């Protein structure tokens, strides 16, 4: 089968023929139709996270397609089902985290496109219990980004605790941020979009953002405080230390700062202000299978629409270059089939 493979860190991916995966008990073989491109894939290819993936590696954790083969022990899925393979490739199923609905914190989890091969290929093996079905009225290209960008931001907004009518600031209007704006509006929240790109802020306005601010032109935190008295919550998708610092300063008393993006730096937090103002700082990592089902339902009902640019698998290195330069609006989806 054809696949895009990381053979050396920080080197171009090789699009080549590799062996088609074989499945075993509890697994399914998915014929990949499309796969979204996430910033995490870039980290996997560069090997710049503390825990590096083993090479060679096929990246991709937004792979969607059709089940072509069902392994022994699988009774809830059949050949022909439309499914996606999320970042949470599998978890142990019996630790405290798995049993309490926090499976994304499982210490024995496997991750698609990082610890196991992912969706930058014509075929992908998957743990049957962790694939999620795609609603019939969503195309593969529309559905793919929901499997990471969508569920990640939807879950992050849930954990803010923000209520309808309250204000939330979305820092970074890229692959995650553009769907975060839509989920926030669908949840009844007022939205401030923050980004360094005017074209991305224009997209945010088209998607329903109530206010937009560019930190190149204004101190975003001060501007937000002047306009709305501070936000009840922030969701930071930008891979930028400055964005996290600004997001913290933009929160009103009792608010929540939810961290999603993963910049390499450490961020100093003023303990006195955090305690005195009752500010909550929360890390949020993707979402559970249930979160993913809910996120897909918003898209199926037309309340969230991913903005996608379709590219052939062979263009992956060009896509990575553009991603590094911040030149992508919405999400790039690789057409694999």
Curated annotation (Swiss-Prot):
Function: NAD(+)-dependent alcohol dehydrogenase.
Co-factor binding comment: Binds 2 Zn(2+) ions per subunit.
EC number: 1.1.1.1
Phenotype for residue 43 to R: Higher level of activity at pH 9
Free-text activity regulation comment from the record: Substrate inhibition is not observed with any alcohols, and the enzyme-NADH dissociation is not considered to be a rate-limiting step.
Molecular function per GO: alcohol dehydrogenase (NAD+) activity; zinc ion binding
Binding site for Zn(2+) 1: 38, 61, 148
Cofactor: Zn(2+)
Pfam family of the protein (one): ADH_N
CDD domains: CAD3 (cd08297)
Full protein name: Alcohol dehydrogenase
Oxidoreductase keyword on record: yes
PANTHER family recorded: ALCOHOL DEHYDROGENASE 1-RELATED, VACUOLAR PROTEIN SORTING-ASSOCIATED PROTEIN 11
Superkingdom of source: Bacteria
Binding site for Zn(2+) 2: 92, 95, 98, 106
Keyword terms of this UniProt record: Metal-binding, NAD, Oxidoreductase, Zinc
Thermal dependence of function as given in the entry: Thermostable.
Top-level EC class: oxidoreductase
The family this protein is said to belong to: Belongs to the zinc-containing alcohol dehydrogenase family.
Entry keyword NAD: yes
Annotated catalysed reactions: a primary alcohol + NAD(+) = an aldehyde + NADH + H(+); a secondary alcohol + NAD(+) = a ketone + NADH + H(+)
Record-linked SMART domains: PKS_ER
């Amino acid at each position: 089968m054809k696949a895009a493979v990381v053979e050396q860190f920080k080197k171009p991916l090789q699009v080549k023929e590799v062996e088609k995966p074989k499945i075993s008990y509890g697994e399914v073989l998915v014929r990949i139709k499309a796969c979204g491109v996430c910033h995490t894939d870039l980290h996997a290819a560069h090997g710049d996270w503390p825990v590096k993936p083993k090479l060679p590696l096929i990246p991709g954790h937004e792979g969607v397609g059709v089940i072509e083969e069902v392994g022994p022990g699988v009774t809830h899925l059949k050949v022909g089902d439309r499914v996606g393979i999320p970042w949470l490739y599998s978890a142990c199923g019996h630790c405290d985290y798995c049993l309490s609905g926090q499976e994304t914190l499982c210490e024995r989890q496997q991750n698609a496109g990082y610890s196991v091969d992912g969706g930058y290929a014509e075929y992908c093996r998957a743990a049957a219990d962790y694939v999620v079905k795609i609603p019939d009225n969503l195309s593969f290209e529309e559905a793919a980004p929901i499997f990471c960008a969508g569920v990640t931001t939807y879950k992050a907004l849930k954990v803010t605790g923000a209520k309808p009518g309250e204000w939330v600031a979305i820092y970074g209007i890229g692959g995650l941020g553009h769907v975060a704006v839509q989920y926030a509006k669908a949840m009844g929240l007022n939205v401030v979009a923050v980004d360094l790109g005017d074209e991305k802020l224009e997209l945010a306005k088209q998607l329903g953002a109530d206010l937009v601010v560019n930190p190149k032109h204004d101190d975003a935190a001060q501007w937000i405080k002047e306009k709305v008295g501070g936000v009840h919550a922030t969701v930071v998708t930008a891979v930028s230390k400055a964005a996290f610092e600004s997001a913290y300063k933009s929160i009103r008393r009792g608010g929540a700062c939810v961290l999603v993006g993963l910049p390499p730096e450490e961020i100093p937090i003023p303990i006195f202000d955090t305690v005195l103002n009752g500010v909550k700082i929360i890390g949020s990592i993707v979402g559970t299978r249930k979160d993913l089902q809910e996120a897909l339902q918003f898209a199926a009902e037309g309340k969230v629409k991913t903005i996608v640019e379709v590219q052939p698998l062979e263009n992956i290195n060009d896509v990575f270059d553009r991603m590094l330069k911040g030149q992508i609006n919405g999400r790039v989806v690789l057409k694999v089939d």
